[in-house]
Structures are given as structure tokens and as C-alpha cells.
Amino acid sequence: MDFSHKAIEKKWQKYWKENNVYKTTDSNHKKAYVLDMFPYPSGAGLHVGHIKGYTATDVYSRFKRMQGYDVLHPIGWDAFGLPAEQYALKTGNDPRDFTLKNIENFKAQLVKMGFSYDYDKEINTADPNYYKVTQWIFKELYKKGLAENRNIDVNWCQELGTVLANDEIIEKDGLMVSERGEYPVVKKKMRQWVLKITDYADKLLKGLDNLDWPNSVKELQRNWIGKSEGCEINFKSNDINIPVFTTRADTVFGATYIVLAPENELVLKLTTPNKLDEVKKYIELTANKSEIERKDESKTKTGVFIGSYAINPLTKEQIQIWISDYVLNDYGSGAIMAVPAHDKRDWDFATKFNLPIRFVISTKDESKAFVGEGKHINSEFLNDLDRIQSLQVIHDYIEKNNLGKKKTNYKLRDWLFSRQRFYGEPFPVLYDKDNNIILVEDDDLPITLPKTDYIKPTNTGESPLANVKNWVNVKIGDREYKRETNTMPQSAGSSWYFIAYILANSKNNLIDLTSDEAKKRLEKWLPVDLYIGGQEHAVGHLLYSRFWTHFLYDLGLLPTSEPFQRLFNQGMILGPDNRKMSKSWGNVINPDDVIDTHGADALRLYEMFMGPLDASLPWSFDGLDASLKWLNRCYRMINKIEFSNTNNHKLDYVYNDVVKKVTQMITELKFNTAISQLMVLVNAIYKEELSTVYKPYIEGFVKMLSLFSPHLAEELWEKLGNNSSVTLQAWPEFDETKIVKNTVVIALQVNGKLRSTIEVEKGTDKETLIKLAQENENIIRFIKGHKNLKYIAVVDRIVNIVIE
């Protein structure tokens, strides 16, 4: 007889809720903070890809709870963002109402899956009680000089009516487009809020060393931060200084021209009148190109001579100044000294435009750029020195002669922190009549979004909030002010949500971050012990949240500077056709349908059994069927069976061996092999007369099963005569002495050659060993017909038969 998954799931979900089984406890010294990357509550709801990561954290949370840990396993909603606003624009609905409806749908799906979330810890980044703290943190960043309002080059998306951060842009056909919707993106100068994450570049780099993260993610962050030690050299053009950052100041004698990024603010100042039209056209052409295309070395180099010259401070030569899209404005100073003899891109550019090439490092082949090591030539006082020696000498010379300075440079740019959209956190900022910035008082937080129909982007660079005059205009006493009308990006709320869970007393009810109670809780729970989510957040959310955590740590509010000690990236679940699930492919699997036909337990078990957690694998309905079939086998094994209270010891070895292996495998997140071990145990149990099987071994199996298929495990636990939740039981222990086999393999030889082996109990005497050898079929074949036989036996090792 098979079990009814619908009846069992409904029964136990009701039990868990009524008995508050998953409430966060605070009774043990040991803690486990296990966290999912919280979802954006889209209209589409959960898909089976979400289920994979959420099931993994649920398995681990249940495991640590049974091991006696206080477990914090919360869930919440990354609720602000473009999709809700885009939907609201199409339908005329308020994005807040749309988001709340989606959250209810998402939550219902999570409950159906039997996840062990503490819903008293539920948070919503778009709830005013939540973003009150987001606004307060922004104020602290501003007070410390880490938030600035600047006129800067930004990524402008006309279709979305807002600026986008670098991590929100992708490349398509050589052009920049928005990650959401793939709309065109261009460079544009605008006044924007930025957070000076660059001030924390060194801390963010060093902090990676002690994190248990995938090396690939750490390398992505290191490369994104991009620390370079070098020198900034001043090239003069009349009375204008052109600072150039280089890691190879030793090649300055080979610098034969200067190249500026087209966006560099010096370009128009340096361009001669006869070149102005040509330069402006080139700047406009470059604005649409993606960084990937501009850095592509295989592309034919383009550029324009701007009509001006600079002086090489070492050679005193007059060299041309060009602009080209292969130089990026957001690295260094947006200018390079071109050394075509020793840089491939400079070589390609110089050969195309017939510019001078001077070798300053010795090479036998001067037909192409030489980028290897060698002695310096044509370099005055650097001649005959190698790279390391010459760098030290030239850096000292440049600083001593006031030609520049040693400098550390980062590829990391400051975080663009404002958006020209309605649906985001309002800034706690006012402007007086002289445009001075005034921070809103703490007592007046949160600044909430108004109820309005003006949510359509203006496409002029202003937020829709600028149209809501009764919200924008504020009178305090007899003074009039205007509110900041830009809103914060979606990444604001997600940069500290892991802290908010700790502060939550009940749904969206947070205690004061600066309170003594907050300090006590934060000291207990931080950092997050296990964080599971996708690698695509490596240089966005994972970097921003580290920055905010470091900042709050420096304020003395947090006990640790790093938010996530252990990070794991789960693989994707692909469609049955081995392609990424997509509505356009028609290969999306809806978990609601699977729960209806197979049940949540089978779905959970299948996704954890598919393969390694970090592997991306195709969906298989055959695999799902097999998971349900095995769960039914488990049910039949226990249903209506009276097990023995006396241990006949037949299953001692396999049970204790499985418990040990499963414990280790769960710790290492090797869930598929842990399930394989449970199958080994079930097979062994079925080989016995079920009524003779030791009941504590059956109970231990049910405890282990509960990690993966909690509804069925609760039902089986009850059928075994227990009246409390299996979730709250202690994790099964194993007896190491029962795992050590009391047998040994004996080698059977004839004239010193191995002919067979036998397995016997340790300590078996010589006479018995010889007798067993004489009865062995393989040995009989080799000694048959021989009479003069000599037997040499060594206990626990060998029997050698010598034919004389």
C-alpha cells in the first residue's frame, strides 16, 4: 500500500504551524545561521530551480537542529525593483499591492514544500518598518563621507527611464543593454548619489582570505576590485596636467603618444578647434559601445588625433594626444601613456595610424610588440636594469623630481546608488533653496512613498516622484525644502537583510539596530554560517553586502566585519531538453504541478538526489518517479510493522556505517551520496525479517529521512508510536566499534603465487586456516595429484602451500 502524499502533507504542515515547531530557539551555546538568497517575489512564482537551493538549506537546517544547535533559518522578500514597477505601468496597479499579492503566492508555495522557516522572522525590504533602517544606514554613510552627490558618467537606459549600475548591464552584439529587458544603454552625465565603496577596497580584498567561499567567486571579486600597484605620471599639455596611471613606469622612455578615453573630461579642453567636430562625432559613436567590445583586442583599432600635444616628462619629447575607445575612463585616470613596442593594443594602434615605436626592453624580434622580460635599452639611467630593478629606480626618480607619485589603483568603481524610478526606498534627504543637503531627522524616518498615479518614468533624468509636488515640497517651521526625488536601488535593501532577520521579533517588526538587545543578538548569530545562492551575484549583492557589513562593523554595531562565513553556489536545474528553463522554450517545470502529482517529499528528495549540489543537470520525470517509488517502499517497510526491542546485531555494521557516512556527507553538502546511503540501509533492512529488526535502528533511519522528506518522516515517526515531532529529536549516533569489521582477508598461495583469498574472523588459528585452504576450490585445482605438500600458515595474513 502506498502513502497519500496530499493527506500527509496537509496534516503535518498544519501540525508544524500550530505547534510553532520551527521557531528560532536561544537555549544552546551552539548556533547555526543558515540562509537562502532571498527571492524577488515575481508574478511567476517559484520554479523548480528555486526549490533546489531552498531544499538544500532546509536539509542543512534540520540537520543542525537535530544536532542540538540553535538554528536561525529565515525567509523574506527582496521586494523593491523594476519588474513590479514595469508590471504596474502596464496594468495601472500600484506596485506595492502587486508585490504583496506575489508575496502571498510565494509564501504559500514555500509552505507547501515543508520548508522549516521561522515565519516570525519574515521581512520585506519594501515595508516602511524595514526601509526605515535602510534610510538610517544611508544617513550614517553620508555622515562618514561615504555617500556623495556627484555629476558623473552613468549608464542611462531611456526605455527604463533610469540609470543602471555596471552589474545591471550586459553586452549584446557589441552594445550595452540592460540585464532586465535588454534595452539599449548609453553613457550620459548626470547628478547622482554614489557610495564610496572604493574606500573599502583594501578591506574587501583582505577579508576574502579567511572566507570559506568557492575560489571562483573570490577570484571574481578580486578581479572586480582589481588592485594594481603602480605610479601616476604627470604629462603636461601647455598648462593642463594629464595624470597617467601605469603599472609599468619603467617603460616611460618608450611612451610615444598619449591616449585618452573618449569620456575623459580633459578631451574637450585639449581638443583644438579644427578637430572639435571629428572628436565629438567619435565620442557619440563610442557612447553606445559595451566595455566588452571596447576591450576586445581582435577588433580593429579606431581613434582620433585631437590636435594637441603633451610633453613626455622623461624624454622631454613632444608627443601626440589621441582619443580611442580601447581606453576606458573608469580605470586609472582615463588616460594611458602608449608604449607600442611593449603593449599589443598600443602596437596595433600605432601601426594603423603610423605613430612612432621605440623599443626600451631588449628583444631579438622587433617585428611585433615584445611583452616579455629583458634588460632595458634606450632608457638612459635604466639601461641594463631588469624590470624589478628599473621599477624601483623610476618610481624613486619620479617622486624625487615631482613628476608624479607612487599609487595604488583599483578597477572597482564607486557604487552608483540612485535610480530615477518610483518604486524604491526614498532618500532621507532634503534640499534648501540654495541646494544644500539636509538630512531628515531620525524621528521623522521612515520617509515613505506617496500614494500617487505618477509612477511613469519621465525619461528626462528626473524621477516620477518629481511630479508629486505635495510630497516633494516640505515646510519645516518657516523654511521650505524639497525632497530628493531619486530612489535607492534594489541592492540597498538586500545589503543588510541578513541582519534584519536577527532584529525581527515578528513579521516586519524590527528592534533598534543600536540597542543593547540588538548587540546581544548580533553577537550570537553573526556571521551567517552557511549561505546558498547563485554565483551570478558575485560582484553585485555579495560585494555590496560585504561593504555594508564592514561599514557597520566600523561603527561598532556588528561583532564581525564579514557577513557570510561559508558560501555555496548551487547548480541550475535545466529543462528536460537540457536547456535553461524559459517560457520561450516551453520547458519550465512548475513545482505546484509536481507537488500535486508526486508530492513535496518526492520533489525534495529528487532534487537532492539528482547529482552534486553544485552541478547543473536536466530535469527528468523518470528520476522523479523513481524518488516517489522509493518513498513508497520506505512507507511499506514501516507501516503496520511491529519492530523488535531486542537487538539481534545483524544490522549493527550497516546501520552504524550509514549513520557515520550520512553525518559526514550532510556536513559536506553531499546530499546525493547521503541519500544513496539511506537506500543502502533500506535494502539491508528488507533482507531481514522485518519484525526482527531492532526498532531504534528504524527510528534512526526515519530521523535521517526527515531531512529530505519531512512530511513522510513525521508520519512514520508517529506510526512508530512517538507523539512528538521527529524534527525536534536528537540526530542518531553511531558506535565506532560496530563499524570496525572483525574479519580479515587471508591470501592463499601455491608456491608463493596468489591463487585465492578467504575472509575469516581475526585470530583464526593456523590449523583452521590450513583446513579452509584445503577446502578452497581454486587451491584444490592447483594441488590435485600432488602428495608432498608443505603448509606454512601465518595467523591473520597468509597460507602458503609448497609443492615439494
From Swiss-Prot:
Membrane-spanning ranges: none
E.C. code: 6.1.1.4
Molecular function terms, GO-annotated: aminoacyl-tRNA deacylase activity; ATP binding; leucine-tRNA ligase activity
Annotated motif 'KMSKS' region, positions: 580-584
Catalytic class of the enzyme: ligase
UniProt KW keywords: Aminoacyl-tRNA synthetase, ATP-binding, Cytoplasm, Ligase, Nucleotide-binding, Protein biosynthesis
Pfam name, any one: Anticodon_1
Binding-site residues, ATP: K583
This protein's name: Leucine--tRNA ligase
Species for this entry: Mycoplasma capricolum subsp. capricolum (strain California kid / ATCC 27343 / NCTC 10154)
Lineage start: Bacteria, Bacillati, Mycoplasmatota, Mollicutes, Mycoplasmataceae
